[in-house]
Curated annotation (Swiss-Prot):
In 8-9 hours embryos, expression is seen in a segmental pattern along embryonic ventral midline. The modification Phosphotyrosine is found at residue 246. This is Signal recognition particle receptor subunit alpha homolog. It comes from the Eukaryota.
Length: 614
């Protein structure tokens, strides 16, 4: 039932393997190493799937070994965890720390461990189902606090109704003088006399004059409101022609964005303190107190200077602090938990140095993991790719997508300015046909960019053009026409602006998937805010899922890169960069850092990690 079992080092050297099917599983193992082990993803589950195959693996951090078993995904093998643990114990028992090159005779031990695991699994299946214990029941999971009655709850007021005792026969039946019954009788007689006494009737006019007149409801007048009478004063369409030129042009921006985008400038100061020594000491004392006192003076000195094997119990206090620290830096809670689980899996069973502390080991492992996550698997070089497309006689197309209000149009204009600075002429396709003012915003950017780079300096050719068809049209059709127009007029780059949409809006997500499928762009960039935390995970997962689900292509085009906006507003809370990159596995191409066209940077991995670890 196991197609392939292998033992290899984390460096990729195969020590021993058993191939029952005779097929090659090299690509599956390489994908496991690249996608899971090196990036420390899903190391807690110890499970990986590729096509019709599934891989169950176990890490040995003490010897830096990986034990992996490959089987068909449709088969469920419940004994694999125990089997891999027994195989690890058998391998360490036979060879220990000895390295024999490629000569590892482990076949007999493998068959023994496998047969024992299969027999134990078969017995477990045949065994009668036993009743679950009290500890496994739902009642045992109730906390003590939930069963304690709260005495501070407001006490309901109870009304006690008491029946009056019957009157005794010795008392007279008539009420005494001054009793409530006398008062009631006197009041009724007075009302009867008032009815019988004739009164002077007042005329209707007198009654009307005596009553004060009620004032009618006055209409509300808003302070900044307007009406049709103010339209003539506000109309500037006649004396302000469309070809108005900008009088105050910030010419200092021209020439500042030539070449490669500059890296993000984030303070990368050394951390003020590696970890609070007192808090670390308290955490370690708590762990030691749980383990109990043992050994006296010798064990005391061994704990100070001796090499120690780290366990999950030792790592837990430091990992909890690190998880809270990551969440405070705006990392999504789910991603922070996965990162800490990954660090725990990489350090469990590893030998500590003589004077190393657990906190320093955790911090070092987490820093390495963050650097790997932020380092791109592939480099997106827009200038190189745009020059390649220009040589092939076609425009280079970029589509911008994202939720509402994150700054898609603004950062599109920044990227457009950067491309103009590098001698590319650009066509902006206004495919946001939904939001009021979207086309006018792009038209304003187009005029401003042409004012910064006038046609007179570029052989009489406008460096930026706007292709728009108004509102309410099909965005995919407008983008197709814009790309065709760019091809006919030999425009170098087409930037497609799309409408902002929430990730749960199915009609708009179908429209975006159609736009990407029909036009087949060179690059799809997701524009997201650096302010978001948990929302970043939901946005990216659902955008990618929608682009894959609503496309009829066998290999749908999903998000290629990320533009992180409003990075200047978050100080050192840079966790959104980790969340977005971890979810998609795609690089952060641009970072928006301000309000001008020159406020566009490339991400600096080390600087971001240093800010995150402060």
């Amino acid at each position: 039932m196991l197609d392939f079992v292998v033992i290899f080092t984390k460096g990729g050297v195969v020590l021993w393997h058993s191939n029952a099917s005779g097929n090659s599983f090299a690509s599956c193992i390489n994908s496991l190493i690249r996608g899971v082990i090196l990036e420390e993803r899903n190391t807690e589950a110890k499970y990986y799937e590729e096509d019709h195959l599934a891989v169950q693996f176990k890490l040995d951090n003490e010897l830096d070994l990986v034990y992996a078993a490959i089987f068909q995904k449709v088969i469920k093998l419940n004994y694999l965890d125990g089997f891999l643990a027994d195989m690890q114990a058998a391998f360490k028992e036979k060879y220990g720390d000895i390295r024999l090159g490629d000569d590892y005779d482990f076949d007999r031990e493998y068959r023994r461990v496998l047969s024992a695991a299969e027999e134990a699994s078969a017995k477990q299946v045949k065994a009668p189902k036993t009743m679950r214990s009290y500890n496994e029941s739902q009642k045992s999971k109730k906390t003590v606090a939930s069963m304690i009655q709260d005495d501070k709850k407001p006490v309901e007021k109870r009304v006690n109704i008491q029946e009056a005792p019957p009157p005794s026969k010795s008392q007279p039946s008539s009420p005494p003088t001054g009793s409530p019954m006398d008062k009631i009788i006197m009041e009724k007689r007075r009302k009867l006399r008032e009815k019988l006494t004739p009164t002077k009737k007042t005329s209707p006019s007198d009654s009307k004059s005596s009553k004060p007149e009620k004032a009618g409801k006055k209409p509300r007048v808003w302070d900044l409101g307007g009406n049709s009478k103010d339209a003539a004063l506000l109309d500037r369409s006649r004396d302000s022609p469309d070809d108005v030129q900008y009088q105050n042009i910030n010419s200092e921006l021209v020439g500042t964005m030539q070449g490669v985008i500059r890296d993000l400038d984030v303070e990368s100061e050394d951390e003020a303190d590696n970890e609070d020594a007192s808090s670390e000491g308290e955490a370690e004392e708590q762990v030691q107190s749980k383990k109990g006192k043992r050994g006296g003076l010798l064990s005391y000195f061994k704990g100070i200077v001796g090499a120690k094997t780290m366990s999950l119990a030792d790592l837990q206090p430091a990992l909890e602090k690190m998880r809270d620290h990551l969440i405070s830096k705006n990392v999504a809670s789910e991603i922070a938990a996965k990162l800490c689980d990954s660090v725990a899996a990489s350090l469990d069973g590893k030998q500590m140095g003589t004077f190393d502390s657990i906190a320093s080991q955790v911090k070092e492992a987490l820093t390495e993991s963050l650097v790997r996550i932020l380092s791109p698997k592939r480099r997106i070089d827009i200038i190189r790719d745009a020059l390649e497309s220009k040589r092939n006689g076609r425009p280079y197309t970029i589509i911008f997508c994202g939720v509402n209000g994150v700054g898609k149009s603004t950062n599109l204009a920044k990227i457009c300015f950067w491309l103009i600075e590098n001698d590319f002429n650009v066509l902006i396709a206004a495919c946001d046909t939904f939001r009021a003012g979207a086309v006018e915003q792009l038209r304003t950017h187009t005029r401003h960019l042409n004012a910064l780079h006038p046609a007179a300096k570029h052989d009489g050719r406008n460096m930026v053009q706007l292709y728009e068809k108004g509102y309410g049209k099909d965005a995919a059709g407008i983008a197709m026409e814009a790309i065709k127009f760019a091809h006919d007029t030999r425009v170098d780059v087409v930037l497609v602006d799309t409408a902002g949409r929430m990730q749960d809006n199915e009609p708009l997500m179908r429209s975006l998937s159609k736009l990407i499928k029909v036009n087949n762009p060179d690059l799809v960039l997701f524009v997201g805010e650096a302010l978001v935390g948990n929302e970043a995970v939901d946005q990216l997962v659902k955008f990618n899922q929608s682009l894959a689900d609503y496309s009829s292509n066998e290999n749908p085009h999903i998000i290629d890169g990320i533009v992180l906006t409003k990075f200047d507003t978050i100080d050192d809370k840079v966790g959104a960069a980790i969340s977005m990159t971890y979810i998609t596995g795609q690089p952060i191409v641009f970072v928006g850092t301000g309000q001008t066209y020159a406020d566009l940077k490339a991400i600096n991995v080390n600087a971001v990690v240093n800010s995150l670890m402060k």
